[in-house]
């Protein structure tokens, strides 16, 4: 079942009123597609935007992960009202994990991950995404390229920049004992997501694992500023 148009309108109206972001047809379409994709994923339940118990004040809740009581939501930072990032909010409401920079990249990523996980046998998320997904992704493109690209490489090159994929690239370089490439990837990671403490914590751990403790401490300090 797809999320109703009224559900997306409710979330769009809430965002418009809460953050003074004009409700456009494009925003409405992307949010409606986001809701449908989340509704099609197992273990998630769509929630109303005013269900704000244990939700970060800058996040509009969209769905609840039933197994963990964490929330998937749209993050609207006070200093960048044009940004509609997709985040996971911890069950206590205090900690945010960035999932995607915007709804379109989140949807595109979910479609590719579904194809990768099922070898193209399942298309529930692609079908749920509607025109947004069809315009973003040509079916089987990842399947045709997976012999040359890992999933994290494909997502980074073809879909967008995701913290989870950049972490994966760094970890792959470390597994191959390629310290220089790992640190270059860390630098890209930092430059893409400068305002996210989780990034600095991860990079600090990387430097610590390489016994570069002074740099590890510098990144740890940056992460709490």
What are these regions (language model features)?
Residues 182-189, 214-224:
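Alpha-helical repeat scaffolds
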Residues 13, 79-82, 119, 127, ...:
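Acidic-enriched, low-complexity/disordered segments with a strong bias for Aspartate over Glutamate
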Residues 131-192, 202:
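Alpha-helical segment of the N-proximal tetratricopeptide repeat
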Residues 1-79, 163, 172, 194-201, ...:
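A surface-exposed partner-binding patch
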Residues 32-160:
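Long, contiguous interaction/recruitment modules in multidomain scaffold/adaptor proteins
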